[in-house]
A protein has these predicted regions:
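Catalytic glycan-binding domains that act on GlcNAc-containing polysaccharides
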Residues: 1-4, 11-172
C-alpha cells in the first residue's frame, strides 16, 4: 500500500497518493508507524514522513530530522543569506506551507514549496528585475525559494523587521 502511494506521488497524483498512504497506515502500531515515517523520508516523501512522524511523536520522542527535515539546504542557505533572513524561519514556513512538496498547489492558487500566489510571483519578478518571468517557473525549486525569501525580506522591510507580523503577512 505504501509502495502504491509512492507510485501515485511519482505520477504527480498527490490526492490519490495521500489516500493510499492513509489507508496503508491506518492499522499500524507505533513501531510500524515509525518505520513508515523513516521509509517515507528515505524516499523523499517528506510530507508523509512528517505527518506520520507526528502520530508517532504522540507516544514517544522522535529524532528531530523526522519531524523537521531540512531538504534543499544549498538553495535555502544561499537565498536566505542573500535576503538576510533566518534559514530556520524559511524552513518553518516551507514545512507549514507545503510540507516540502515542490508541486504543491493550494485551493486558493498558491504554488510551490513556499506557496506563492501568482500575482505575488509577478510582483516579486518585477521587484527583482526579472524581465522574462514565466508563471510556471514558480514550481521550480530554486525559483520558488528565491522568490519566497525575497518576499519575506520585503515583508520584513515593510513591517519594521517584525518577524511575527511578517509571518502573518506572508499568508495575508
Amino acid at each position: 500500500s505504501l509502495e502504491r502511494a509512492k507510485a501515485f506521488y511519482d505520477l504527480g497524483l498527490i490526492a490519490e497518493g495521500n489516500r493510499e498512504w492513509q489507508w496503508g497506515i491506518r492499522t499500524l502500531n507505533t513501531a510500524e508507524l515509525l518505520a513508515a515515517a523513516q521509509w517515507a523520508q528515505k524516499h523523499d516523501l517528506l510530507h508523509r514522513s512528517i505527518n506520520t512522524a507526528i502520530k508517532v511523536a504522540e507516544h514517544y520522542p522522535l529524532e528531530h530530522d523526522l519531524l523537521y527535515p531540512r531538504p534543499f539546504e544549498d538553495e535555502i542557505e544561499d537565498y536566505a543569506e542573500m535576503a538576510k533572513i533566518d534559514i530556520n524561519w524559511v524552513y518553518g514556513l516551507m514545512r507549514q506551507e507545503s510540507r516540502f512538496i515542490a508541486a504543491a498547489r493550494s485551493s486558493v492558487g498558491a504554488n510551490g514549496l513556499m506557496q506563492i500566489m501568482p500575482a505575488t510571483a509577478k510582483w516579486i519578478a518585477k521587484e527583482l528585475e526579472i524581465d522574462n518571468f514565466k508563471p510556471e517557473t514558480i514550481y521550480e525549486i530554486e525559483t520558488n525559494i528565491y522568490f519566497g525569501t525575497a518576499y519575506l525580506r520585503s515583508l520584513l522591510d515593510r513591517l519594521g523587521n517584525n518577524i511575527i507580523l511578517a509571518t502573518a503577512g506572508y499568508n495575508a
